[in-house]
UniProtKB/Swiss-Prot annotation:
This is Aminopeptidase 2. Coiled coil: none annotated. A divalent metal cation 1 binds at E250, E316, E340, H345. It comes from Geobacillus stearothermophilus. A divalent metal cation 2 binds at E316, E340, H378, D380. Highly thermostable.
């Protein structure tokens, strides 16, 4: 019997009932690495018991990904199986829920030409644009969770043997996702309620700008008019509540694509498609990255920024307290799902249309006029620390504290 059998049962239940919140008669689509097979079986069983009509799954294998990037001809990375793209669109149109299980090897493609990776990413993003638009507009319930793999566990706990490292990573995941509590679903209900109170507070404020102060120059982010803060649970267009990310500690909203100025430096490594980018700075002027540097992964960062015009602009600003459970673990996960919930972060690329009033019903032209960024990519990177202060600027120019020393500057009942 698996050492984590009880916890895996609870994790599967959390993914099905809180993550995607499967509804009677609904289809669930699961994308997962081969290493997640025991958990996927539990998820399928729980989904059917909860009323799912179908559970479809798609396996991925990093060894095959590695082989392709090293041996496939160049033209292979400019092609995408449109049969899969159409299948994803059809599932979305039919109201399916989508669960992705993410277990990255941060160094998988470190010796691959970054141009190959950039071409493959852009090709996939173009082919899956309609599906991703549906997901980012919350037309469907979707969720992202993670499971340990030997490569990932070794990156986080490099001083331990594989089995010990995997056990330590499972322990961290179960603690951070509240699986270690007696009733994880109730714990998540309480957590979502707390995040909702913060969201309500910030939505009522409707700050026109955020001012970031940490060691270094001031960094400013203008927010779009009619911006909407979100955090914790989301609501699909059919009215079903779901949690897109497990874990999540953030509240986030939409910057104006032309209203970002100053220089920011990352505070945690960014794992981007099998490569680590670290020690990097981005300098913005009138919303656009006009200069950048990186101590590690410079070419990968360059190709990311060159994806399209929107890749050099921000699509998301997110606030996460330094005292979050992920941060308090004192671990660097090299997995954005976890690391973004340890620190305030920004996202290059496409904005979530739900972060502006009536955004899901606006045309691309209307969204552009209102300052909403569009891109083939959406990549979060972490800038928060214990030294970070953030003020909100009201419409009449008054500055009010939001963060002090990396944590919330206000108390809510």
């Amino acid at each position: 019997m698996n050492r984590w059998e009880k916890e895996l049962d609870k994790y599967a239940e959390l993914a099905v009932k809180v993550g995607v919140n499967i509804q009677p008669g609904q289809t669930l689509f699961v994308n997962a690495p081969l290493e997640a097979a025991p958990l996927v079986r539990k998820i399928a069983k729980t989904a059917y018991e909860t009323g799912a009509k179908h559970v479809y799954f798609e396996w991925n294998d990093e060894a095959l990904t590695y082989i392709k990037f090293h041996h496939a001809p160049e033209e292979a990375f400019s092609e995408y199986p449109m049969l899969r793209a159409r299948a994803m669109e059809e599932l979305a149109e039919q109201g399916a829920a989508f669960l992705s299980i993410h277990a990255p090897n941060p160094d998988l493609l470190k010796d691959v030409d970054p141009k190959r990776i950039a071409t493959a990413n852009k090709t996939a993003a173009q082919a899956l644009a309609n599906y991703r638009s549906a997901i980012m507009a919350d037309r469907n319930c979707w969720s992202l969770i993670s499971v340990p793999t030997p490569a990932w566990a070794q990156k986080v706990f490099g001083d331990l043997r594989d089995e010990e490292a995997i056990d330590k990573l499972w322990e961290a995941i179960f603690r951070i996702t509240r699986i270690d509590q007696d009733d994880p679903i109730a714990a998540w209900r309480e957590h979502n309620d707390r995040l909702a109170r913060i969201v309500d507070y910030l939505n009522n404020k409707q700050y026109k700008q955020l001012v970031y102060e940490a060691p270094g120059p001031i960094f400013t982010v203008e927010l779009v008019d009619g911006h909407v803060w979100h955090g914790g649970a989301a609501t699909s267009q059919s009215g079903v509540r779901f949690n897109p990310n497990i874990p999540t500690e953030e509240v986030f909203t939409m910057p104006h694509k032309d209203g970002v100025n100053g220089t920011v430096r990352n505070t945690k490594p960014l794992n981007y498609n099998g490569n680590v980018i670290d020690g990097f700075t981005l300098t913005f002027k009138d919303g656009q990255v006009v200069d950048f540097s990186a101590e590690q992964g410079y070419e990968t960062l360059k190709h990311l920024l060159d994806t399209d015009d929107g890749a050099r602009r921000l699509g998301e600003v997110a606030l996460v307290p330094h005292q979050s459970p992920v941060s308090l673990s004192n671990l660097i996960f090299y997995n954005t799902l976890f690391d973004e919930n340890a620190a305030c972060h920004l996202a290059l690329g496409k904005a979530y249309p739900t972060n502006i009033e009536n955004g899901a019903s606006l045309s691309k032209e209307e969204l552009d006029r209102r300052g909403v960024n569009d891109s083939l990519v959406h990549v979060d990177f972490m800038i928060g620390s214990a030294d970070l202060n953030i003020d909100g600027v009201t419409k009449d120019g008054k500055r009010e504290p939001i963060f002090r020393s990396g944590n919330w500057a206000f108390e809510l009942a």
